[in-house]
Amino acid sequence: MKKILILPLLLFFLVQGSMAQTPKWVEKAKRAVFSIVTYDKNDKMLNTGNGFFVSEDGLALSDYTLFKGAERAVVITSEGKQMPVSLILGANDMYDVIKFRVAITEKKVPALVVAKTAPATGADAWMLPYSTQKSIACVTGKVKDVSKVAGAYHYYTLSMHMKDKMVSCPVMNAEGQVFGIAQKSSGIDTVTTCYAAGAAFAMSQKISALSLGDAALKSIGIRKGLPETEDQALVYLFMASSSLSGEDYEKLLDDFIRQFPANADGYLRRANYYASKGKDDQTWYDKAVADFNQALKVAQKKDDVYYNIGKLMYAYQLSKPEKTYKDWTYDTALKNVRQAIAIDPLPIYIQMEGDILFAQQDYAGALAAYEKVNTSNIA
């Protein structure tokens, strides 16, 4: 009888011990882990893998290999909801990490906090697999070794058994913060040892002004984000104008304006893009006018906006349109340029004044403008 009672008690304590080993934060943290499906240019499934959110507005991390050659990608949350990957925000093919944004369909999503400090050798670690079940069996282990990456970041060797389906799952510390992105085991001991790229290192990946030439990013067909600073983003826009398709360039302009709504250059560039499409459909000119008006509202240097409006109208008239759009005449172009000159008489503005007067066959006025330019500091 005693033996019969002891067996259930032993099982009870074993279950209780197993549950005690699972940290309290696991239940909440597991909801930040998702599955990813990538598709090629023929919209055929390319790869499947894992990733996880690191911000409630849809910022996420995964492995670069999963996205290589992909034209689109979809994440599937632990609740089974599908959301598209909208932007690639940085990648490193050497350490196989990628940062991207998901177009979330909710106000916010569950997200993990990226650890600010690296765990010490010997520290406990937990790997959270993707799961649609209520219960989750996280893998436990230890940090075996910590090595430096790119100066301030880290790469980890873990004493932990990992299955292939756990690649790019988050590796957590005792506080429930993510410090690593699980990577495939390699080498002699793949049973008890696996690796993790630093989550902070993955977060440091970004788009720069020169990213258009980055081979790793070029191998991904999904749209790229903009650099985080205005100056870098403007250089990126300039370079993209000659290398992207018209449709992709327009989307990039929209992104710039969303990211930097107080920067007049975004509206000016998009206005010029709209105007270039207006020959066959004049509603594009309406859009250009709306952007010019917005540029005037936000610009700190309104003379630059007036100059660009005049310059565009001048170029429009030089193209000899069959029917002039509203007031886009040489006279209106001249009016805008002279408003720019009234604010700041820069030689480039006066040069444009001369060009417009010359086009109007006001040669005396054009000569007077050109003579001013010739006596300026740019002559």
Each model region followed by its residue ranges:
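A conserved glycine-rich beta-strand in the N-terminal activation segment of trypsin-fold
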Residues: 21-22, 39-57, 63, 82-84, ...
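Flexible, gly/ser-rich surface segments that form the specificity/activation loops bordering the active-site cleft
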Residues: 21-25, 108-155, 162-166, 182-194
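C-terminal cap/linker of serine protease catalytic domains
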Residues: 22-26, 181-255
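Conserved active-site neighborhood of the chymotrypsin/trypsin-like protease fold
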Residues: 55-126, 133-137, 152-153
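Structural motif corresponding to the intra-repeat A-B loop/turn of tetratricopeptide repeats
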Residues: 243, 277-278, 282, 316, ...
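Short coil turns that delineate tetratricopeptide repeat
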Residues: 261, 300, 343-345, 375-378
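Residue-level recognition of tetratricopeptide repeat
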Residues: 272, 276-279, 311, 318, ...
